[in-house]
Amino acid sequence: GVISAGYAAAPAYAAAPAYAAAAAPIEYDPNPHYSFEYSVSDAHTGDQKAQHETREGDVVQGSYSLVEPDGSVRTVEYTADPHNGFNAVVHRQAGAHPAPAPVAVAKVAAPVAYAAAPAYAAAPAYGYKHL
């Protein structure tokens, strides 16, 4: 005879209802404007840099500067617009003093502990006899 193991078909589930997501309207600004600037002067790392940028419609103007490792200051002035594309002019001014070298941090490796490999007894040898 047939022995039943007590198995049954998997239950059927209904699909979750689908709802249309409400998309937020995308706001288009035909004449965008912004202006930002920042600067960094970190005596500990020697990091010195600055940036300024403005946008009026489709025209972007800005500049950024940084101190090179030799102490000179590199300044890049740039413009971008639909007619001329992106244009940059780089200026370099000799520095009075070289930029401070980053602080060297000594890295000491932790000591490595060595242990002898464990010793094991020899594996038993098996043989056979032919009768």
Curated annotation (Swiss-Prot):
One cellular component (GO) term of this entry: extracellular space
Domain Chitin-binding type R&R: 31-101
GO molecular function list: structural constituent of cuticle
Keywords: Cuticle, Repeat
One Pfam family it belongs to: Chitin_bind_4
Keyword Repeat in record: yes
Sequence repeat ranges, renumbered to this chain: 9-12, 15-18, 109-112, 116-119, 122-125
Family matches, as InterPro entries: CHIT_BIND_RR_consensus (IPR031311), Insect_cuticle (IPR000618), Insect_Cuticle_Struc_Prot (IPR051217)
Keyword Acyltransferase attached: no
Domain comment in the entry: The tetrapeptide (A-A-P-[AV]) repeats found throughout the protein are also present in many proteins constituting the protective envelope of other species.
PANTHER family membership: CCP84AA-RELATED, STRUCTURAL CONTITUENT OF CUTICLE
Function: Component of the cuticle of migratory locust which contains more than 100 different structural proteins.
Designated name of the protein: Cuticle protein 7
